[in-house]
């Protein structure tokens, strides 16, 4: 089971229309576009997917649509985390019902929960997932939950946990986790250190910019497997040039704008309170879309 979870997996964006409603046709196109890139799986309903500005019904609808398009073609991981254990359990049940391969959940946030409360939260979700492995999602910069190494070690050894999405930027900690848990599936979370994360022990990655250049990240994996560190470094540099621009524009809206210019996403808007891309960046984003389309062929 754990073997199937390894690889390069875009953190899927969620397209919306001009009325801020889910854009189902754009979502279907985006799933097909990602699969055509040769990625290994999709991570659905996470931070990149703007899950926390969606209702539970909307999140379930996204899971259903993605499963219709991708089940049996690539590995599917449903992020079901919310601050509410009950709602997370309901989403986990939906993920099982729609045929996902695993569930994932960010640490519960906003309130200062005790570590034992975090553990109980994960146990409850795992029970509701009916046998699907859990991918623990550690992202302290957004969750505000700063887990110690000992706490991470405890979480990843809970019955039912099969993987960790490590979005902390701490490569030393990544290596420590790998050393302590050689059989754990370990994902690099920050795209800008993907190659370094692999060298520190990650089995693959889950990232937002994979939506527009997943083949580059697959190229990094292949280069390192072949011992070509220079090629991996070159590809990481090319990815980071894109990330530099997206950080200026706002990552999610920048990605949607690039995908709009690629004729994948109809409306390049995130859900409010996110604002649209500043128009001054549109020429650069359009040029990036053209460059990536030419590179991909």
Swiss-Prot record:
Q: Where does aceneuramate bind?
A: 47-48, 167, 189, 191-192, 208
What family is this?
Belongs to the DapA family. NanA subfamily.
* Gene Ontology MF terms in the entry: N-acetylneuraminate lyase activity
Which keywords annotate this record? Carbohydrate metabolism, Cytoplasm, Lyase, Schiff base
Catalyzed reaction equations: aceneuramate = aldehydo-N-acetyl-D-mannosamine + pyruvate
Protein name, as recorded: N-acetylneuraminate lyase
Q: Please give the function described in this protein's UniProt entry.
A: Catalyzes the reversible aldol cleavage of N-acetylneuraminic acid (sialic acid; Neu5Ac) to form pyruvate and N-acetylmannosamine (ManNAc) via a Schiff base intermediate.
The organism of origin for this protein:
Citrobacter koseri (strain ATCC BAA-895 / CDC 4225-83 / SGSC4696)
- Which cellular component, as a GO term, is one annotated location? cytosol
Q: In which pathway does it act?
A: Amino-sugar metabolism; N-acetylneuraminate degradation; D-fructose 6-phosphate from N-acetylneuraminate: step 1/5
Domain of life assignment = Bacteria
Q: Where is the active site?
A: 137, 165
- Location in or out of the cell: Cytoplasm
Against PANTHER family, the record matches this protein to: N-ACETYLNEURAMINATE LYASE
What is this enzyme's class at the first EC digit? lyase
Q: Name one GO biological process term.
A: N-acetylneuraminate catabolic process
SMART domains under this entry?
DHDPS (SM01130)
Read off the Pfam families from this record: DHDPS
Its Enzyme Commission number(s) read: 4.1.3.3
Q: How does it assemble?
A: Homotetramer.
Q: Which InterPro entries match?
A: Aldolase_TIM, DapA-like, NanA, Schiff_base-form_aldolases_AS, Schiff_base-form_aldolases_CS
């Amino acid at each position: 089971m754990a073997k199937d979870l390894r690889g390069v997996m875009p953190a899927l964006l969620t397209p919306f229309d001009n009325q801020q409603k889910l854009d189902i046709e754009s979502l279907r196109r985006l799933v097909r576009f990602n699969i055509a890139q040769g990625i290994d799986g999709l991570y659905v309903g996470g931070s990149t997917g703007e899950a926390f500005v969606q209702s539970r019904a909307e999140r379930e609808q996204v899971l259903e649509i993605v499963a219709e398009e991708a089940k049996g073609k690539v590995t599917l991981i449903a992020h079901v985390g919310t601050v509410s254990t009950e709602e997370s359990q309901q989403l986990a049940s939906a993920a099982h019902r729609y045929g996902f391969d695993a569930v994932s959940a960010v640490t519960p946030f906003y309130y200062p929960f005790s570590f034992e409360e975090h553990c109980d939260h994960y146990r409850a979700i795992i029970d509701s997932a009916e046998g699907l492995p859990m991918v623990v999602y550690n992202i302290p910069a957004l969750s505000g939950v700063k887990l110690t190494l000992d706490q991470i070690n405890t979480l990843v050894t809970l019955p039912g946990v099969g993987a960790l999405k490590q979005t902390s930027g701490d490569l030393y900690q990544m290596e420590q986790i790998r050393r302590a848990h050689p059989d754990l599936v370990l994902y690099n979370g920050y795209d800008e250190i993907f190659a370094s994360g692999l060298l520190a022990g990650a089995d693959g990655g889950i990232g937002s910019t994979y939506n527009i250049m997943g083949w580059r990240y697959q190229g990094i994996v292949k280069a390192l497997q072949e011992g070509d560190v220079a090629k991996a470094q070159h590809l990481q540099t090319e990815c980071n040039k894109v990330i530099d621009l997206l950080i200026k524009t706002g990552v999610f809206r920048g990605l949607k704008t690039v995908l709009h210019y690629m004729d994948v996403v109809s409306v390049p808007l995130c859900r409010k309170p996110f604002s649209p891309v500043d128009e001054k960046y549109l020429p650069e984003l359009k040029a990036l879309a053209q460059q990536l389309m030419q590179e991909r062929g």
